[in-house]
Structure formats: C-alpha cells, structure tokens
From Swiss-Prot:
Pathway listed: Amino-acid biosynthesis; L-histidine biosynthesis; L-histidine from 5-phospho-alpha-D-ribose 1-diphosphate: step 2/9
GO molecular function, one term: ATP binding
Lineage of source species: Bacteria, Pseudomonadati, Pseudomonadota, Betaproteobacteria, Burkholderiales
Any one GO cellular component localisation term in the record: cytoplasm
EC top class named in words: hydrolase
Subcellular location: Cytoplasm
Superkingdom assignment: Bacteria
Name of this protein: Phosphoribosyl-ATP pyrophosphatase
EC number: 3.6.1.31
Catalytic activity field: 1-(5-phospho-beta-D-ribosyl)-ATP + H2O = 1-(5-phospho-beta-D-ribosyl)-5'-AMP + diphosphate + H(+)
Main location class: cytoplasm
Alphabetical list of Pfam families matching this protein: PRA-PH
Similarity field: Belongs to the PRA-PH family.
UniProt keyword annotation of Amino-acid biosynthesis present: yes
C-alpha cells in the first residue's frame, strides 16, 4: 500500500505557492517562441490545441485510474493527474484566469454539501436564463 501525502493547513500554503509559481512560469510563455517552448507552442496554436490537450490528459487520467484499481502503479495515476493539472493551468492562463480564481471558487464551496451546491447552481442558472 502506498502512503498518500495529504494537504493539511500547515502545508496548504506551500501547495498553493507551487501552483502559483508554476502558473507564473506558464504565463511567462505567452508570446514566447513556439520553436523553443512547448507551452508557447500550445498558446500559439490557439484554443483548439489547448482544449484538445485537456481532453487527452483527462482520458489518460481515467485509464490510469482504472489501471491503478486493478493492480497498476499508483504513481502512474499521480503522473497523469500532474499532466492534467499542468494542462489545466495552461488553459487557465490561455483564458486569462489563474489558479487563484479556481481556489476562490473552491473556498466559496467549502463546507457546502455537493447536493446543496448543485441546487444553488441550478437556481442561479435559472435566474440568469430568465426561467
């Protein structure tokens, strides 16, 4: 059995710092040379290339999770999730968003049950659509 590293209040700041540092590096690749930077190449190719990578990486996470459940290496799952998170950071940057935006939304939802949050979201969507 592998040991999981849980985020606790004492190490949450360093986890957030890691995301923010990585996001800053990704942001710095905007306008960079697509011949020398993978991230610059994705930005240069546009929305479809960035979004396609999200789909590919999400599929790889699902497959790695299924493998891990059936005796595969948990480290492979962690690696695939890291790839997905990285490409999500690229996507956020591409759309001029940041990890702070996502963290703020998660904080807003914290302490609220998933059922309650979903009901509030549906109600808000109905109000916005004039239903």
């Amino acid at each position: 059995m592998t040991q999981s590293t849980q985020t606790t209040p004492s190490n949450a700041a360093s986890t957030t710092d890691t995301l923010l540092r990585l996001a800053a590096i990704i942001d710095s690749r905007k306008g960079g040379d697509p011949e020398v930077s993978y991230v610059s190449r994705l930005f240069h190719k546009g929305d479809d290339a960035v979004l396609k990578k999200i789909g590919e990486e999400a599929t790889e996470v699902v497959l790695a999770a299924k493998d891990a459940r059936h005796g595969g290496a948990p480290k492979a799952l962690v690696g695939e999730v890291a790839d997905l998170w990285f490409h999500c950071l690229v996507m956020l940057s591409h759309f001029d968003l940041s990890p702070a935006d996502v963290l703020a939304e998660l904080e807003r939802r914290e302490g609220m049950s998933g059922i309650e949050e979903k009901a509030l979201r549906k109600s808000r969507d109905r109000e916005q659509n004039g239903d």
